[in-house]
């Protein structure tokens, strides 16, 4: 028997169920068997546990079924009625049941039974339509349990299908509200991120402005200091020049007096001793003046050397100030890089928090309203299994 024939589990119509003999399998057993086989195939395709399968996942059945990749691709396209590129569990189960078709025992049924079965809407298709009407066909990751519960209620307790629809509607409403709240939170986070970027940009502009103002202030201060020192040195230089000029004038006057006394020496031999004493005094004064002149020249030389040293110190100071400004600029650039790194880490933390929050919200929903237990005289419970989808 081929794997395709092992997957054939038809949905009996009302006519077939009413005319079936006691030795044939019950419709519930056939449906459960078909659902279990479809689920096994779906799990074989969805090895990552995504909750849906793609065309590439469908091609993994090549090792399980005697079908070529082209045939598997054709099967996937026939099942993908929405043309969205993937199949949910219910779409796979319902489409696979229709694609596999009836077994050999159903081929001999009468034409009237076949027409009656075609008119009947399969339970799984009806369940899929209800999920699509509620907008929940893409909300639930695993829909096998819900489909099984729906089929059992359809078979055993059709009057409870309305209750299950209300529970599904209530659950879908809360899930949609949660998704809207998540969208609002994401919008708020994006707005906060934009505000943060704007604040960082403003801080960067303020730092640039402060750096420019500090640079201009230091340049103005250095110019003022250089101007004041230059004026002071020029004033001292003019003072020393005046003193030197006065000393030279005094020296010339003394020399003139010496010449005058020398010319009068012949006429005043009697006053020779006195003139010699005066001459000696004048010579002493001349020597003192020369010493003062020498001292003045030495002081002038020292002033010139001091001016040169100060000029070199100014150059070194200007170089030092420029180096300090370069170091300060590098420090500000490093601070800016730190701010950018902090901003990147904040974005990464926000993305991780959003991903964790999306995962936690995907596996949580508001529990449905509990209904009282059935008080009828039946021996079995109206709630054969949990109605939760997970």
UniProtKB/Swiss-Prot annotation:
Record-linked InterPro entries? Ca-binding_regulatory, EF-hand-dom_pair, EF_Hand_1_Ca_BS, EF_hand_dom
Gene3D superfamilies membership: EF-hand
Pfam families assigned to the protein according to its UniProt record, in alphabetical order: EF-hand_7 (PF13499)
Q: Report biased composition (Low complexity) as residue ranges.
A: 1-27
Could you list the residue ranges forming a coiled coil in this record?
173-357
Its keywords, alphabetically, are: Calcium, Coiled coil, Metal-binding, Repeat
Q: Where does Ca(2+) bind?
A: 80, 82, 84, 86, 91
Q: Where is the EF-hand domain?
A: 33-66, 67-102
- Which GO-annotated molecular functions does the record name? calcium ion binding
- According to the UniProt record, where is the region Disordered? 1-37, 206-234
| Entry keyword annotation includes Calcium | yes
By sequence similarity, the record places it as follows: Belongs to the EFCAB4 family.
PANTHER family in the record: CALCIUM-BINDING PROTEIN 8, CALCIUM-BINDING PROTEIN 8-RELATED
Record's protein name: EF-hand calcium-binding domain-containing protein 4A
Give me the gene this protein comes from.
cracr2b
């Amino acid at each position: 028997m081929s794997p395709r024939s092992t997957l054939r589990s038809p949905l009996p119509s009302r006519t077939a169920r009413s005319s079936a003999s006691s030795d044939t399998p019950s419709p519930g057993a056939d449906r459960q068997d078909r659902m279990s086989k479809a689920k096994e195939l779906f799990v074989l395709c969805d090895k990552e546990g995504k909750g849906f399968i793609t065309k590439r996942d469908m091609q993994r059945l090549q090792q399980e079924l005697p079908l070529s990749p082209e045939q598997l691709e054709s099967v996937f396209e026939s099942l993908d009625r929405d043309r969205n590129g993937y199949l949910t569990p219910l779409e796979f189960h319902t489409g696979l049941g229709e694609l596999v078709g009836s077994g050999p025992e159903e081929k001999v049924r009468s034409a009237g039974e076949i027409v009656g079965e075609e008119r009947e809407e399969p339970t799984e298709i009806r369940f899929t339509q209800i999920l699509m009407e509620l907008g929940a066909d893409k909300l639930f990751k695993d829909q096998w349990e819900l489909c099984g519960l729906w089929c059992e209620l359809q078979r055993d307790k059709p009057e409870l299908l309305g209750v299950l629809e209300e529970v599904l509607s209530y659950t879908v409403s809360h899930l949609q509200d949660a998704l809207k709240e998540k969208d609002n939170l994401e919008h708020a986070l994006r707005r906060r991120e934009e505000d943060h970027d704007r604040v960082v940009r403003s801080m960067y502009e303020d730092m640039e402005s402060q750096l420019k103002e500090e640079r201009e202030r230091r340049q103005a201060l250095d110019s003022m200091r250089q101007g004041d020192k230059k004026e002071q040195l020029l004033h001292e230089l003019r003072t020393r020049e005046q003193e030197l000029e006065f000393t030279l004038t005094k020296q010339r006057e003394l020399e003139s007096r010496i010449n005058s006394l020398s010319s009068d020496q012949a006429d005043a031999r009697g006053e020779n001793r006195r003139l010699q004493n005066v001459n000696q005094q004048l010579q002493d004064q001349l020597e003192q003046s020369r010493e003062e002149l020498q001292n003045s020249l030495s002081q002038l030389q020292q002033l010139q050397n001091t001016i040169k040293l100060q000029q070199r110190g100014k150059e070194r100071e200007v170089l030092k100030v420029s180096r300090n400004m370069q170091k300060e600029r590098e420090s500000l650039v490093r601070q800016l890089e730190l701010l950018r790194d902090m901003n990147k880490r904040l974005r990464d933390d926000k993305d991780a928090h959003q991903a964790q929050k999306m995962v936690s919200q995907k596996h949580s929903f508001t529990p449905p309203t509990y209904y009282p237990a059935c008080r009828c005289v039946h021996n079995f419970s109206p709630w054969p299994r949990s109605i939760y989808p997970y």
